[in-house]
C-alpha cells in the first residue's frame, strides 16, 4: 500500500480551503497526501478548524520537525507568499509540494517549479515554463512558449497568450488577458478584466481595456 506523505498548507484562509479541496481531489484518483492541517501565523486561528482540518500553529512549528516536511503556500498575495517562503529558507527539512488538479489539461513539455499550485479547469499548452511558487487559479489558460516567473499569482479565468513573459511577483487579476508576445515587468499588478496589448515596463497597478497605469 502506498505511503501517504504528510502535507501542511500555509494559509488558513479561503484559498487555503480551496487547496485542501484540491488535495482531496488528487487523493480521490491517486492517494498521495495526508493533509495534517493548516499553518498560519495569525495566533487567533490556532487550535481552530478550517474545512475540517486543524490550524496547528505558525510557521515556526515547521522548523521544529526533524523529518522531511511537505508544505505548500496557499497565500494569494505574491509578495506575502515570497516573504513566507524566504522566511522558511533556513529550514532544511522543508520540501515544497507541487499540486495540480486532476482536471488540468497540461502538455508533457511544461516545466513547473516547486511549490506551484494549478487549480481546476486550467489549460497549459506546450513549451511553457512556470517558476517556483506560482499560483494559477481556476479556469486559466497559458499559451505556448509563455514564461511565468516565480511567485506569480493568476486569479481565476486569466488568459495568457503564447510567448508572453511575466516577471516575478506579478499579480494578474480575475478575467484579465495578455495578447501574444507581451512582457510584464516584475511586481506589476494588472486589475480584474484588464487587457494587456503592449509591454508593461514599469512597476505599478494597471487597469482598463487596454490597461493603463493608475497614477497616485
Language-model segments: which ranges?
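Active-site catalytic pocket residues across diverse enzymes, especially alpha/beta-hydrolases
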Residues: 23-27, 88
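A generic structural signal for alpha->beta connector loops
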Residues: 32-35, 52, 68, 93, ...
Amino acid at each position: 500500500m502506498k505511503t501517504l506523505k504528510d502535507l501542511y498548507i500555509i494559509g488558513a484562509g479561503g484559498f487555503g480551503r480551496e487547496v485542501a479541496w484540491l488535495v482531496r481531489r488528487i487523493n480521490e484518483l491517486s492517494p498521495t497526501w495526508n493533509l495534517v492541517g493548516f499553518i498560519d501565523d495569525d495566533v487567533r486561528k490556532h487550535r481552530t478548524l478550517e474545512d475540517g482540518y486543524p490550524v496547528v500553529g505558525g510557521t515556526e512549528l515547521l522548523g521544529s520537525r526533524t523529518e522531511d516536511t511537505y508544505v505548500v503556500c496557499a497565500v494569494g498575495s505574491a509578495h506575502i507568499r515570497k516573504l513566507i517562503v524566504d522566511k522558511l529558507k533556513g529550514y532544511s527539512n522543508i520540501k515544497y509540494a507541487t499540486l495540480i488538479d486532476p482536471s488540468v489539461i497540461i502538455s508533457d513539455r511544461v516545466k513547473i517549479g516547486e511549490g506551484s499550485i494549478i487549480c481546476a479547469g486550467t489549460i497549459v499548452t506546450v513549451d511553457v515554463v512556470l517558476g517556483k511558487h506560482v499560483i494559477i487559479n481556476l479556469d486559466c489558460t497559458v499559451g505556448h512558449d509563455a514564461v511565468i516567473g516565480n511567485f506569480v499569482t493568476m486569479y481565476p479565468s486569466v488568459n495568457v497568450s503564447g510567448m508572453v513573459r511575466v516577471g516575478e511577483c506579478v499579480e494578474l487579476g480575475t478575467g484579465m488577458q495578455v495578447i501574444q508576445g507581451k512582457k510584464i515587468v516584475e511586481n506589476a499588478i494588472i486589475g480584474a478584466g484588464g487587457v494587456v496589448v503592449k509591454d508593461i515596463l514599469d512597476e505599478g497597478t494597471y487597469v482598463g481595456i487596454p490597461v493603463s497605469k493608475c497614477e497616485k
